[in-house]
Amino acid sequence: MSDSVCPIDAKEELLRECENIWKEMEKCQSKLTLLAAEPVPESDAKVSLLLTRMQALRAEYHQWQKRNPELISTNPEVLLLLGEEELQKVKKELEMVLSAVQLKNEKLKEDLEREQQWHDEQVQILNAFKEIEEEMKKEVVTDSEKRVFQELKNQMLELKEYKKKLMNALGEFLEEHFPLPEKNGNAKKKRYSEEPPEQVITIHEILEILLNQLMSTPHEPYVTVDDSFWPPYLELLLRSGIVLRHPEDPNRIRLEAFHE
């Protein structure tokens, strides 16, 4: 027999030790059964049985108090096998945690896209009301039309207020999940070795710049990228389909025209 024990022999040794421990437990159980089987008066049977069990448990308790914890086996191969099994359990738990984090990231991306879609819809509605307002200014306003105009104006104010709340909610969402990158390499994108520039802007500001450009000059919606645009944020927006590059100039980007 060689000095080293194969994993199969280690398992067999571990099983033998477990069987020995089980036999000792069976002996203790047999002793308890014999104690419980002693004849007692029928009237005191339950009390005597309970007292016997109490004494047995108390004796077992004192015995365990005197014992020190023991390893199941001192065989290095057995301990190595048990350690490998424990590592496999830890690995599975970590894989489950990783899967949960990935699902959460996907959910955050979906929430961002949904918030952007809601914002674009409100921009469309606001632009439609602005067009109606301009057309009505060119016409002769009658009393009835004044009332309609006032109602539309109130609705437009409500939409502006709703847009403001929506922008605030979007800003809070982006600040929570996409904060400004920290210096000294503490940014979210660890694969970027260089530190972020001093004047880097948030992802919320990037979207606001692109949105203002699209609304003010829809015929020229592109914005030139400078050092204040942090590359990881640009990649995230490009991968999500929220931002598009200029077909001829990669340094210029625009907001996706979701309303078209």
Curated annotation (Swiss-Prot):
Gene (name only): CENPK
Organism: Gallus gallus
Biological role stated in the UniProt entry: Component of the CENPA-HI complex, a centromeric complex involved in assembly of kinetochore proteins, mitotic progression and chromosome segregation.
Family: Belongs to the CENP-K/MCM22 family.
Cellular component per GO, a single term: nucleus
GO biological process: kinetochore assembly; mitotic sister chromatid segregation
Keyword Cell division assigned: no
Signal peptide: none
Top-level taxon in the UniProt lineage: Eukaryota
Keywords: Centromere, Chromosome, Coiled coil, Kinetochore, Nucleus
Assembly notes: Component of the CENPA-HI complex, at least composed of CENPH, CENPI, CENPK, CENPL, CENPM, CENPO and CENPP.
UniProt-recorded name of the protein: Centromere protein K
Ranges in a coiled coil: 84-173
Subcellular localization: Nucleus; Chromosome, Centromere; Chromosome, Centromere, Kinetochore
Main localization of the protein described in the UniProt heading: nucleus
Taxonomic classification: Eukaryota, Metazoa, Chordata, Craniata, Vertebrata
Nucleus in keyword set: yes
